[in-house]
């Protein structure tokens, strides 16, 4: 069954309800002022569910969704008319850089029981999926000579293994020539990590370490949108690593269960990290999702953005250091993967929810 919408972010209080949701490539920013609908039948039902959610500690996701599903269900036909296409496969990356955006507000009529929504007549075009474009004029001088691919020439490819193809634009894409590669978007809130990762990928490439020999990603250039002075950087490309049907990284249950290969993967990761350190390059983000297993069942080290995972590397003094890399590898294989100790991985939860109506 197709998803009616995905909620990516939301703020709920007794005085204000604001949500951001997407349907296909279209995004909606919806404001629901409780005071404006409190005298309507729908508004009263909404407020009962809202107060039930706010009374819970800790907050519950199902309770969080109940008032939103009630209100969004009431306006689902409007959302469907404004965003008739749900499927994103085959769309260009540029479609998400300039995504149709509606800023809507729910309100109750002064005299009557009807709840309406306003703002449907005006469409804005803004970056979607948390893409945070960077002007080429503001990019480091060292990026000037980097190969650049237009976002309009890259198309989304979604695999069956993906739990939620709408969580991020990151993933497999195809060029107009039919070549498969991997797109990493520049996302809001991760600007520093993006800059660091590009610099590390450049250093890996310049040192001749990229590729299968050392199991490190090959930097294939930046992704841009627009032309001339208005051109912006929206991401970069690296080679796409083909994984087995079992999964793609150490956190995948099918991969993690391959106990006989754990030592091999540990040795490979240690060798790769050692090679990086010999060239004064720090991995900076040791965690299960950043060890990719390819179709030959070999372990690759990816993601040098430096967004440190405190479960594996101590934030206070070891983040983005060689010592931190070694600590991370030890905790990853010596504790987490082996099951020794009580180390647990706390996954980052993206604030979105699939709504099937």
Region locations from a protein language model:
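Conserved structural core of kinase catalytic domains
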Residues: 185-264
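C-lobe/activation-segment region of protein kinase-like
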Residues: 259-264, 278-284, 292-357
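Phosphate/pyrophosphate-binding loops and the adjoining catalytic core of nucleotide-dependent enzymes
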Residues: 1-186, 191-192, 200-201, 217
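Conserved protein kinase catalytic core
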Residues: 227, 245-246, 291, 309-311
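Charged catalytic carboxylate motif
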Residues: 196, 268, 328
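Conserved hydrophobic alpha-helix
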Residues: 269-276
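Eukaryote-biased feature marking scaffold/signaling PDZ-domain proteins and nuclear chromatin regulators
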Residues: 178, 214, 231-233, 281, ...
